[in-house]
């Protein structure tokens, strides 16, 4: 820093090496004269122009005091050495670095300071630090050469520093930085005071000079005092120095002081607006002891910016040289230049190129590569009120990693515009060491391959200062962050333009190409570096490394790169490995795509591929859900659309697996609504249960809104869901139930008649009869019905025992009761809406004449499969016989074979459950089945009669025996009737039921012809009153008479 007397915090040995091996040496014969100040245009007569030198990035040299009258040569390496800027009235001034000390000695007393060439400071804006009274054109020809002892001393001290840095590199101890700093302070050489002065020296402006005054000065003041044509601006290397330095293997892969960055320089200080921060007692700038007053600091001179005169304020030189490490196994000296090596060790700057200057054919090389000297900083170096802290967490193994992974990109040096045609230059290889700080001419791709650490810390881009206040990110680790799409890592990036890649130098013979575009794998974007734009070309080998196109959002105006999520409207990458080691290739995606598009699958078959508990099924489910876009939808709306795509079937845990994948997808599409996937999954399952409770066949009170909210308390990752959200979901499901998807084939079929009866009239809601309108109609007519017994033989209550007249229709195996006075003779007509009472199934039923009922004539009874008993009265006896025959024929034709009897340890008799579904067999098969059932029932009845219970046995056993006997006798009679009717049906030549009835009547009449016999009589009519004629009147005693006056009050006592 200019005028800063603080001791260095971080030593960098190559700064001292550059200090003594730089441009102070005379060029080799046949070589273009070397300049200490690089300019864009040829030199012109010096006018009033202020030359503002901006301190280089991490390379400020702590120089011991110099006597008066002592002048030192320009030292260091330079990149752009083609000429001086036109000396115009131009002011390059910014605020002086805040870390500069106020007690800096004024310029004068014969002490002048050289500008140390900093290749890393080649793209940064220059500060106008020259005072109005600075000497102009003080660099005069004929300055004396530096003596030979200076070169020997340089080699000696450089060897010591290089050895120390090698020790630090081998030990791989990060904490050695502080100890090395103290050691390097002692190793700093004290230049001899009797060195001959060089007219190319000039002193830095005073420290206490205000930046505002500098910026207001007229242009052209304080111009640098070196001219290109000066023959003695740099001493020439002798044979001894060349053999001692360039042939020494110790320095072939030595750390370099700076890396060239085209017109860029990292400022280590903050602007004056934050000057108060750095002056604290704990600041390293204030803890360093000042240098003697009779000395001035060496100022590293840098070249002007990319053509724009805007200066950057708040930049200063670091108070110490920072070491930069290179792999010692790589030799990139003159051999690499001679062989045309494609790349040199990463991070080398133009200082190395200058060391190759003694070669006759060598010339100063123009480097366009942006170098990244530093890896990860230990503290925030941003100008936002943060002092410069010592670097920490330096990883030596990260510095020495070879084999860069960054693609090699050839850049057209924009500084070729600044060269003169008469200075041919060789192109030397240069490799970029990437770091998470970007420059206007180099911005990394978001998904370019990772690069290894090339330096101890990140270097911020000056372009961030041009656009605003640079934000230097703090990195906690000692290793460079890797370039990935992770948002947490991409937050360390400064976006300014192009992509950082391995950069190459252009040969001197090429003409400048301003305005060329950056080309990277088919994606072109102009480099935003001011007036001159470099050209980047990818080689064939580099196309294999650059696999991802540049993100168009990475522009200099954006402070941070926008990391793209891998799942925004896209499926997950197919290269991920599953838990069992199976690679998730395109097999799962192809199957999911076919399931989503229903290519060869039905909606009812999709769930079977998503609900299994294995890795492949989970992968298919994840890929399947990736086709759904739930962004901006509510949870119930997204669930409705999802349930329309597939039939959610299977067991509870299988459905839960599918719903979990739905929850993951919904949370991915709407990450801000719910805190986690579990909360979405919990609410999804609650909605499914609510739909079942509100719209299912549940018995009891439905769930209320308050109960729904209460049941979800504490299930939102320990908290509660918003009540407004739960209320909206509740009323959405209550007003409209969740519709299930159905196959298209099912919707195309004609719906079967499913009568919707009131719930109160359905005594057995789970007993659903097959009501097919396509089955034939056996008979219809007017019948009076009376319910005598309910299911299981229970007596029907008194209020339901009355006789009712219905238009009865026997269709298939169902007996329908319709309204009277309407025509119901149409075949295939749906009876929905015409039924006035519950239909009765006649499967496994038996109709017989009701001989025991004498109150009404022409009455027959019907015993159903569930042991109900109905009484029907027909208009005539013929109608009664016809109804009995046709009801039994329908039962024999459509009754399926019974299930096997249940097996249990109870001795209590339980009637077997008979199937409700219709039989699918033919009449012959039905006949054989009924014969087998008849034989089985007859055998069971015979066995029961053989095993009679004991007369003195318990009453329960006797009752069980009686019930079993009645059932077996009824089953035997029923199957006998079925067999008889089916035999007559099979023997009937026509399908007409009328002809079948006539044949059946003839067979029944021949067998049932009455025989002549005596009638049984009794002496006392009162013994058998049931056999007495109905017209006989029997006078009873008053005590035997019953009146309803006494019974009704007793039965209705509680109701009165």
From Swiss-Prot:
GO terms for molecular function: guanyl-nucleotide exchange factor activity; phospholipid binding. InterPro entries: PH-like_dom_sf (IPR011993), PH_9 (IPR041681), PH_dom-spectrin-type (IPR001605), PH_domain (IPR001849), Sec7_C_sf (IPR023394), Sec7_dom (IPR000904), Sec7_dom_sf (IPR035999). The keyword Membrane applies. Residues 438-456 have a biased composition (Low complexity). Residues 776-892 form the PH domain. Residues 921-976 form a coiled coil. Residues 88-99, 128-137, 466-476, 486-502, 548-567 have a biased composition (Polar residues). Its main location: membrane. GO terms for biological process: regulation of ARF protein signal transduction. PANTHER family: GUANYL-NUCLEOTIDE EXCHANGE FACTOR, PH AND SEC7 DOMAIN-CONTAINING PROTEIN 4. This is PH and SEC7 domain-containing protein 4. The lineage of its organism: Eukaryota, Metazoa, Chordata, Craniata, Vertebrata.
């Amino acid at each position: 820093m200019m005028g800063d007397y603080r001791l260095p915090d971080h030593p960098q040995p190559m700064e001292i090496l550059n200090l003594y091996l730089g441009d102070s040496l005379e060029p080799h014969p046949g070589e273009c004269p070397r300049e200490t100040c690089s300019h864009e245009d040829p030199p012109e007569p010096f006018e009033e122009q202020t030359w503002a030198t901006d301190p280089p990035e991490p390379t400020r040299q702590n120089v011991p005091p110099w006597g008066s009258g002592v002048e030192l040569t320009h030292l260091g390496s330079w990149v752009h050495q083609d000429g001086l800027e036109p000396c115009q009235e131009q002011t390059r001034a910014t605020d002086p670095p805040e870390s500069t000390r106020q007690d800096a000695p004024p310029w004068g007393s014969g002490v002048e300071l050289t500008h140390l060439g900093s290749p890393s400071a080649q793209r940064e804006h220059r500060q106008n630090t020259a005072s109005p009274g600075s000497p102009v054109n003080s660099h005069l020809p004929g300055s004396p050469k530096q003596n030979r002892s200076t070169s020997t001393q340089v080699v000696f001290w450089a060897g010591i520093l290089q050895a120390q840095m090698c020790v630090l590199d081998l030990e791989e101890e990060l904490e050695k930085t502080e100890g090395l700093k103290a050691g390097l302070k002692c190793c700093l050489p004290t230049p001899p005071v009797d060195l001959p002065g060089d007219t190319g020296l000039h002193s830095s402006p005073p420290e206490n000079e205000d930046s505002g005054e500098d910026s207001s000065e007229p242009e052209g003041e304080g111009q640098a005092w070196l001219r290109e044509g000066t023959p003695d601006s740099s001493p020439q290397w002798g044979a001894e120095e060349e053999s001692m330095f360039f042939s020494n293997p110790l320095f072939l892969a030595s750390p370099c002081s700076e890396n060239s960055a085209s017109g860029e320089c990292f400022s280590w200080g903050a602007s004056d607006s934050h000057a108060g921060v750095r002056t604290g007692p704990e600041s390293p700038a204030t803890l360093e002891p000042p240098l003697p007053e009779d000395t001035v600091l060496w100022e590293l001179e840098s070249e002007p910016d990319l053509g724009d005169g805007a200066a950057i304020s708040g930049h200063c030189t670091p108070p110490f040289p920072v070491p930069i490490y290179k792999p010692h196994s790589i030799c990139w000296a003159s051999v690499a230049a001679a062989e045309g090596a494609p790349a040199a060790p990463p991070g080398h700057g133009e200082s190395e190129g200058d060391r190759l200057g003694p070669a006759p054919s060598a010339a100063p090389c123009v480097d366009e590569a942006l170098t990244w000297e530093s890896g990860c900083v230990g503290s925030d170096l941003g100008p936002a009120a943060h002092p410069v802290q010592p670097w920490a967490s330096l990883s030596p193994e990260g510095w020495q990693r070879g084999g860069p992974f960054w693609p090699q990109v050839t850049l057209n040096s924009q500084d070729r515009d600044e060269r003169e045609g008469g200075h041919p230059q060789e192109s030397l290889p240069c490799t970029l060491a990437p770091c998470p700080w970007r420059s206007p001419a180099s911005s990394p791709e978001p998904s370019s391959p990772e690069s290894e650490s090339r330096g101890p810390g990140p270097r911020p881009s000056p372009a961030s200062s041009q656009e605003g206040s640079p934000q230097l990110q703090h990195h906690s680790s000692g290793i460079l962050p890797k370039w990935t799409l992770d948002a947490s890592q991409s937050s360390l990036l400064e976006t300014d333009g192009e992509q950082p890649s391995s950069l190459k130098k252009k040969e001197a013979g090429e003409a400048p190409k301003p305005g060329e575009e950056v080309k990277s794998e088919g994606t072109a974007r102009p480099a935003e570096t001011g007036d001159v734009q470099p050209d980047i070309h990818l080689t064939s080998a580099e196309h294999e490394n650059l696999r991802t196109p540049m993100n168009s959002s990475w522009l200099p105006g954006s402070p941070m790169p926008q990391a793209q999520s891998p799942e925004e409207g896209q499926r997950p990458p197919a290269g991920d490995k599953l838990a069992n080691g199976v690679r998730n290739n395109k097999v799962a995606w192809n199957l999911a795509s076919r399931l989503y598009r229903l290519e060869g699958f039905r909606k009812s078959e999709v769930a079977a591929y998503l609900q299994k508990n294995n890795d492949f099924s989970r992968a298919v489910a994840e890929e399947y859900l990736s086709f759904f876009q739930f962004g901006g939808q509510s949870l119930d709306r997204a669930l409705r659309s999802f349930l329309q795509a597939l039939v959610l079937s299977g067991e509870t845990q299988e459905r839960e697996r599918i719903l979990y994948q739905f929850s993951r997808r919904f949370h991915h599409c709407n990450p801000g609504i719910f805190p986690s996937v579990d909360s979405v999954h919990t609410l999804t399952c609650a909605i499914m249960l609510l739909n079942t409770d509100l719209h299912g066949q549940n018995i009891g009170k439905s769930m209320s809104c308050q109960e729904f909210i209460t049941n979800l308390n504490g299930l939102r990752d320990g908290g509660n869901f918003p009540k407004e959200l739960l209320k909206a979901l509740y009323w959405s499901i209550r007003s409209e139930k969740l519709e299930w998807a159905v196959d298209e084939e099912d919707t195309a079929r004609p719906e079967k008649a499913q009568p919707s009866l009131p719930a109160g009239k359905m005594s057995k809601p789970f007993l659903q009869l097959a009501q097919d309108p396509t089955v034939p109609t056996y008979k219809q007519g007017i019948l009076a019905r009376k319910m005598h017994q309910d299911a299981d033989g229970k007596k029907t209550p008194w209020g339901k025992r009355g006789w009712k007249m219905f238009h009865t229709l026997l269709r298939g195996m169902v007996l329908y009761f319709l309204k009277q006075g309407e025509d119901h003779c149409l075949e295939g007509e749906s009876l929905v809406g015409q039924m006035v009472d519950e239909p009765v199934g006649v499967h496994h039923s038996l109709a017989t004449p009701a001989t025991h009922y004498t109150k009404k004539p022409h009455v027959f009874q019907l015993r159903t499969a569930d042991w109900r008993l109905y009484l029907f009265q027909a208009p005539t006896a013929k109608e009664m016989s016809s109804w009995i025959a046709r009801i039994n024929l329908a039962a024999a034709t459509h009754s399926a074979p019974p299930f096997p009897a249940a097996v249990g340890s109870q001795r209590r008799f339980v009637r077997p459950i008979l199937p409700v579904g219709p039989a699918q067999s033919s009449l012959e098969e039905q006949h054989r089945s009924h014969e087998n059932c008849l034989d089985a029932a007859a055998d069971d009845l015979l066995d029961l009669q053989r095993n009679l219970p004991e007369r003195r046995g318990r009453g329960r056993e006797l009752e069980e025996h009686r019930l079993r006997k009645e059932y077996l006798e009824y089953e035997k009679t029923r199957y006998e009737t079925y067999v008889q009717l089916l035999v007559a049906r099979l023997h009937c030549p026509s399908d007409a039921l009328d002809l079948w009835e006539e044949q059946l009547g003839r067979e029944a009449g021949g067998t049932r012809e009455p025989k002549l016999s005596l009638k049984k009589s009794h002496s006392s009519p009162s013994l058998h009153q049931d056999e007495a004629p109905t017209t006989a009147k029997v006078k009873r005693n008053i005590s035997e008479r019953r009146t309803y006056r006494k019974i009704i009050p007793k039965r209705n006592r509680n109701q009165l």
